[in-house]
């Protein structure tokens, strides 16, 4: 009967069924549901409006329920889940379910203990996640829908067909949303219980299954996880090694645990093989896997359920019962209940037969090892929706490389000599550039010129913030460098004779921190045993604890020159290579022919029989051309005889004598060979001058020539150590002579034509007299080159400053009976007789005194010198500020150096003139204690008591008046080098190049000329990647508890809104971790992986050098952004921040990845940059300390007496890792707030330097390792209430591993383009290689190799 009525109704509406609809919604619903459901839905439209409004919600809920679950169970994702029905699921917010699990056991020999428990009670908790969707139907559409089936003509039905279409569209869209929502919930829950492969593999390792949560196990966990992460990252992009990919897929299937409840009859093939799990991924990854392993993949039909279980709880059943029922109760019964508004249990359905609760579905299967796995991609679920596919992730990786490292000779070998041939210059020069590839596989190059907007910024060149942080109160027990015992005296006493005796009568003073630093060589400097390491905060400044007013205080002073860096940070070998690099850039040729002259000069200056008469003549001539002409005969005799008989070059201890001999004796009687050597010495000065001019510009900047900013030898503020004529000096310079203020322009003029009795009286006094000569600037520069570069290199500091006591020597040498005779004898013999002392001096020079005519001529020439005699030497103290580019940090700083006015340099201990010479160790270049003790017995006694002080490397104590280590222009590293250098032109070049200044202008000039600036730079860049993950889940690893959908409506005058809600709860059914993920496929690189260097002028917009002209010059030449503190926009930047606007066309290059610079010593170990490491130079990952103990955390991170976790040094870069260092100041937000920065500018370094970020990362990692270590066992042998889900922070570890581990990855890069191109050519040798001074850093994650393919 019912069938007949149904047939009549079908017949009556036949025309409507055949009407061609624009959308195929009806067919779609019919395919997914039984035909009866569709017919009932159509029949229902003929009811009254009241019935429609009442019952539509119930009908739609049932309809969606059926579509939803049939669609889910028809996918391979259904393999992962039990589906259980629970009508009251909305009341189940948190549920606790207990399972009895049988424990498998192995029989053992008798007498061996074995477990007696056959079962274990496992507790699982439910997680509720309701899903919902809403849609609107207009009132007019509903009315049209009603009229279409009630008292309507056929024409009305045709006219209102659009109303039906709209309604069906809403119904279909909402049901489709619930289908997608269910799959999304299941996938999300599976991911929530699926740790990454690198974590799960560690937990399954033999050493990983230790639940003890001590520091050792946490460290082992992190080390293992960090090692495994690069291995599994982007594995499907490494198509060259299919075996490795298959091995990882096999490991993924083997790592997961089985389910507590597995129905072996479900999801089996026709051949009886059971599907063990499902590999869920995206369509891209599935295509890659299919193409790569097509032989292992086939399509097959498997048995799958088409019904869900029912969740039953009762007193009799305290555990869980699963009973299979039909997916949906009978439709008519449900409608009847809804109409009567009565609730009651549903009877068994006659809609579907109970026997048909299983069917077959077609799925892709892959044989991975001995495991059969189903393949599923879910892109179709998320396509064209606003919901993000949880298998698509954004990965953030930070990379590092280094530019400008120096490789010592011990490792300056080649591993690529057979593949790469570079010219000798490039091969052996310190590199000033780094090469790498961007995401388009285009070669990129970064040079020091690209880093200028960091290296020339005021913040980088400023030491005030570092000094402010370094200034502190000394705590009890604080570990201090021994240099803190050095007493800082701002006004030391002048070292007169009595003071000198007192000084050398006491014990030697404590060594300074600078001196102690230079006792360390190579990597010893970076070790915890270096107690001075904490004072190394900035390459351009010296920091030290010192004694001030009998208390420990702090001092910070500019280093002024590159040569003042500690030798461990800029070793002699590096300085020499740098000088050869400058020689190459200057296009000059190494003066090999000069080496003969240099050898002869070395032999002369190291000869203990150096003629002492040379000292007398050089002092009496004192650079005066007329005096030199008067002594012409005497000088010629000394040169010719000394050169002929002793193979020596007299007078080369004095610059002015060399100058006058080379330029004024070309047509004299001097031997041509000897004169050639003097001319070569003079030419060598010119050669060195040209060398250090390399990189300079013409013109002036703030009243100083550009060369003044480049090299200190051109700075008028630095005077030569020996002065005979005052040069033009800066007005802000202060000069003291013998500790008395001196006005050079107001000094008394010498008038040699007038007998000045007052000057004769003051020969040994303190009044300064001068010749009416202003020395030309180029002569002053040449003099500084000779005294600061050539003589130290020739003598290895074995010279000593001295004063000839003319007030004693002249009477004893000339005004005596041997020299002055009665007038009758002069008339008769026509000759001067030399005194005994003068005879000895002449004979020491090889001049014969036996022939009287010659002696008369010589002595006449000698006597004429007395007419232009100077005074005894005066000690000059020159103080003044530095140049404008160096003084912005400490404008009150006054650099100090000392010179001898009309003094000279002793080459060897004097024998004849010992009583007429006063040794003055005024400069560490010229303070040889062996020479000084010959003139001062109290120094000899001092050396006898303290033989360790007999040294010429700056370790010989000199009075505090001369030894002001932190204020002098030249400091200990200079003396260390010149003490041991070879006596060659190369050493002279090195000393000249060591005078290169530390300043932003100098850095710009050097970088522009491709000259190494004296320090390396670590480049740090963060890149973004779109990654597609693989999820593998074992069979039945989760139960999904569903409730009946319920619909409620909100009705207004114009439309009705329907809200459909489905309650879903999930229960993990795994014995342990039953699912695993792997970031397998690199889909695209979001950032450009390029070479866009950070502009610190945007980060710190108001920092200034304190001089408008200098600021403008620096910003203009470096390309820095101009900003003014008075600009309202600048105030807004400091207050609210401002996004860095990309001014270049973004369509060409995409999203830029910003590169930041961390200044680094050139001696930082290269191996540190070849492995994942913290770019600040010291590990920040501290697992032994609870991150909540902030004081302990701070100590472990910044206390460098504790070895670094990674390298077992204290640090690889003290300028970045020490609290208050320049790197810390620039990138640590704790300090940044003191200097005004733009908070909206992205900084890739911030995550490694900011203490807050470090603390958060450590807290997360500490929790992750602890939680996962506690889950290293299964639920049988571990805690029965442990829930095997991903712990909080796992997603951060997957998406931002560099932040969590506090490490960046090495970038494939090389200091030479040839090395890089050779490396990527097949067959590529996967290792980091070196080629003498050049190096190649291999990447740990083979991104470049992926891009290449």
From Swiss-Prot:
Record localization: Virion; Host nucleus
Alphabetized UniProt keyword annotations: Capsid protein, Host nucleus, T=16 icosahedral capsid protein, Virion
Superkingdom per UniProt: Viruses
Keyword Iron: no
Keyword Signal part of the UniProt annotation: no
An annotated GO cellular component: T=16 icosahedral viral capsid
A molecular function (GO) term: structural molecule activity
HAMAP family documented for this protein: HSV_MCP
Annotated family: Belongs to the herpesviridae major capsid protein family.
Subunit description: Homomultimer. Makes the hexons and eleven out of twelve pentons. Interacts with triplex proteins 1/TRX1 and 2/TRX2; adjacent capsomers are linked together in groups of three by triplexes, heterotrimeric complexes composed of one molecule of TRX1 and two molecules of TRX2. Interacts with scaffold protein; this interaction allows efficient MCP transport to the host nucleus. Interacts with capsid vertex component 2/CVC2. Interacts with the small capsomere-interacting protein/SCP.
Role played: Self-assembles to form an icosahedral capsid with a T=16 symmetry, about 200 nm in diameter, and consisting of 150 hexons and 12 pentons (total of 162 capsomers). Hexons form the edges and faces of the capsid and are each composed of six MCP molecules. In contrast, one penton is found at each of the 12 vertices. Eleven of the pentons are MCP pentamers, while the last vertex is occupied by the portal complex.
Name the UniProt record assigns to this protein: Major capsid protein
Species of origin: Elephantid herpesvirus 1 (isolate Asian elephant/Berlin/Kiba/1998) (EIHV-1)
